[in-house]
Amino acid sequence: MAPAAASGGSTLPSGFSVFVTFPDLLFIFEFIFGGLVWILIASSLVPMPLVQGWVMFVSVFCFLATTSLMVMYIIGTHGGETSWITLDAAYHCVAALFYLSASVLEALATITMFDGFTYRHYHENIAAVVFAYVATLLYVIHAVFSLIRWKSS
């Protein structure tokens, strides 16, 4: 974290220090658990398309946005600008709220699964709920520490 701060005045890491600084190392876990959520939902029969459509939107959007941010941090796109700290905090707050709503809706869709769905699809949806709540927790933690970083910048 010190090299990024020394080079441009930013507390955002660049290069591979993204993978060793907190809270930015959470990108890896957000990427993994977010990807698992949309893969599990896509592979199951969708019992409530409208509800799970929102869950798919949130998980794919956050997966792509997290991947984009992580790549931009690695290549140093932020260039030491403090506006990137604001962007980071805002994104993670929005992602945490979106994922919380998606987690609750996925739990609702799983609870209300009716006859005609196999146990395999039911278990895939249960796993998607668990991973969605893990992703929510990761985004909340990242949002809190990004807000702390934003306030101190």
From Swiss-Prot:
<feature type="transmembrane region" description="Helical">
    <location>
        <begin position="126"/>
        <end position="147"/>
    </location>
</feature>
<keyword id="KW-0472">Membrane</keyword>
<keyword id="KW-1133">Transmembrane helix</keyword>
<feature type="topological domain" description="Cytoplasmic">
    <location>
        <begin position="1"/>
        <end position="24"/>
    </location>
</feature>
<dbReference type="GO" id="GO:0098737">
    <property type="term" value="P:protein insertion into plasma membrane"/>
</dbReference>
<dbReference type="GO" id="GO:0120003">
    <property type="term" value="C:hinge region between urothelial plaques of apical plasma membrane"/>
</dbReference>
<dbReference type="GO" id="GO:0005783">
    <property type="term" value="C:endoplasmic reticulum"/>
</dbReference>
<dbReference type="GO" id="GO:0002175">
    <property type="term" value="P:protein localization to paranode region of axon"/>
</dbReference>
<keyword id="KW-0812">Transmembrane</keyword>
<dbReference type="GO" id="GO:0016324">
    <property type="term" value="C:apical plasma membrane"/>
</dbReference>
<dbReference type="InterPro" id="IPR013295">
    <property type="entry name" value="MAL"/>
</dbReference>
<comment type="similarity">
    <text>Belongs to the MAL family.</text>
</comment>
<dbReference type="GO" id="GO:1902043">
    <property type="term" value="P:positive regulation of extrinsic apoptotic signaling pathway via death domain receptors"/>
</dbReference>
<dbReference type="Pfam" id="PF01284">
    <property type="entry name" value="MARVEL"/>
</dbReference>
<comment type="subunit">
    <text>Interacts with PLP1.</text>
</comment>
<feature type="domain" description="MARVEL">
    <location>
        <begin position="18"/>
        <end position="151"/>
    </location>
</feature>
<comment type="function">
    <text>May be involved in vesicular trafficking from the Golgi apparatus to the cell membrane. Plays a role in the maintenance of the myelin sheath, and in axon-glia and glia-glia interactions.</text>
</comment>
<dbReference type="GO" id="GO:0043220">
    <property type="term" value="C:Schmidt-Lanterman incisure"/>
</dbReference>
<feature type="transmembrane region" description="Helical">
    <location>
        <begin position="54"/>
        <end position="75"/>
    </location>
</feature>
<dbReference type="GO" id="GO:0019911">
    <property type="term" value="F:structural constituent of myelin sheath"/>
</dbReference>
<keyword id="KW-1003">Cell membrane</keyword>
<dbReference type="GO" id="GO:0042552">
    <property type="term" value="P:myelination"/>
</dbReference>
<dbReference type="InterPro" id="IPR008253">
    <property type="entry name" value="Marvel"/>
</dbReference>
<dbReference type="GO" id="GO:0044853">
    <property type="term" value="C:plasma membrane raft"/>
</dbReference>
<feature type="topological domain" description="Cytoplasmic">
    <location>
        <begin position="76"/>
        <end position="92"/>
    </location>
</feature>
<keyword id="KW-0449">Lipoprotein</keyword>
<protein>
    <recommendedName>
        <fullName>Myelin and lymphocyte protein</fullName>
    </recommendedName>
</protein>
<feature type="topological domain" description="Cytoplasmic">
    <location>
        <begin position="148"/>
        <end position="153"/>
    </location>
</feature>
<dbReference type="GO" id="GO:0016020">
    <property type="term" value="C:membrane"/>
</dbReference>
<dbReference type="GO" id="GO:0022010">
    <property type="term" value="P:central nervous system myelination"/>
</dbReference>
<feature type="transmembrane region" description="Helical">
    <location>
        <begin position="93"/>
        <end position="114"/>
    </location>
</feature>
<dbReference type="InterPro" id="IPR050578">
    <property type="entry name" value="MARVEL-CKLF_proteins"/>
</dbReference>
<dbReference type="GO" id="GO:0045121">
    <property type="term" value="C:membrane raft"/>
</dbReference>
<feature type="topological domain" description="Extracellular">
    <location>
        <begin position="115"/>
        <end position="125"/>
    </location>
</feature>
<feature type="topological domain" description="Extracellular">
    <location>
        <begin position="47"/>
        <end position="53"/>
    </location>
</feature>
<feature type="transmembrane region" description="Helical">
    <location>
        <begin position="25"/>
        <end position="46"/>
    </location>
</feature>
